[in-house]
Amino acid sequence: MREITIGQYIPGNSVIHRLDPRTKILITTAFMVLLFVIDDFTGYAFPAVFIIAVSILSGISLKYMMRGLRPLVIIIVLTFVLNLFMIKGRVIYEIGPLDITYEGLYQGTFMVLRLIMLIVGTSLLTLTTSPIALTDGIESLLKPFRRVGVPAHELAMMMTIALRFIPTLMEETDKIMKAQMARGADFASGNVVQRARSLVPLLVPLFINAFRRADDLAMAMESRCYRGGENRTRMKQLRMTSADLAAFIATGLLAVGSIMSRFIW
């Protein structure tokens, strides 16, 4: 559970770390949309190269980011299996009443690849952006909506805290599982339904710890006289540079290349 990378931050001074947080948020959003627009394997060659390039520039190894997929293996396998057996088409192999089709195999592999790129791509945002910078970036992007009554700072703070709590909750789950296994609990044996039922006793202590951490955070913010974004100043002002412009251009080329690939190959 502790291996999940979404929500974690690795300090650094790479060119990716130094990018304006608004740039990284917008590029990540565009990257996610692009993954759902692409509908063939050739188009995914460009996002794959993009992820590898960002990994090299950020100094965060691709192997480390792939570790974040381990807690989600069940979801990835389930996605593949559902597509494999549910999509009708040219039959490759029969397993009783179930048919494995060419179209199902193609779509299952395609969806797994999309899911992996989605997880790894979004992980890069939090891995290279500090919580403060992420909050400032989201708040700045939401600032125009203040005119219609949207609390930009509060919403940005909520989103950032939610992201940062993901690895914390995963760590809490891991600790509770180990404590219960030491007392004889078995989470590994049995069928899928039995394993799911064995996880129910984890929920009560997990929610109690989550509420306790949330209460501690609220008390810490209250003791520091936190009053939202009212009259709040920043030590570092957000300012885009030529590196941000280059990042936007690279993302634009990525989008064009991915979409045009269907007409080339």
UniProtKB/Swiss-Prot annotation:
Keywords, comma-separated and alphabetical: Cell membrane, Membrane, Transmembrane, Transmembrane helix, Transport
One GO CC term, this protein: plasma membrane
Gene Ontology molecular-function annotations: transmembrane transporter activity
Topology in the lipid bilayer: Multi-pass membrane protein
Transmembrane segments: 32-52, 72-92, 115-135, 150-170, 245-265
Chief location bin: membrane
A Pfam entry, by short name: CbiQ
Intracellular or extracellular location(s): Cell membrane
Subunit structure: Forms a stable energy-coupling factor (ECF) transporter complex composed of 2 membrane-embedded substrate-binding proteins (S component), 2 ATP-binding proteins (A component) and 2 transmembrane proteins (T component). May be able to interact with more than 1 S component at a time.
Stated family: Belongs to the energy-coupling factor EcfT family.
Function comment: Transmembrane (T) component of an energy-coupling factor (ECF) ABC-transporter complex. Unlike classic ABC transporters this ECF transporter provides the energy necessary to transport a number of different substrates.
Protein name as it appears in the record: Energy-coupling factor transporter transmembrane protein EcfT
Origin species: Thermosediminibacter oceani (strain ATCC BAA-1034 / DSM 16646 / JW/IW-1228P)
Gene: ecfT
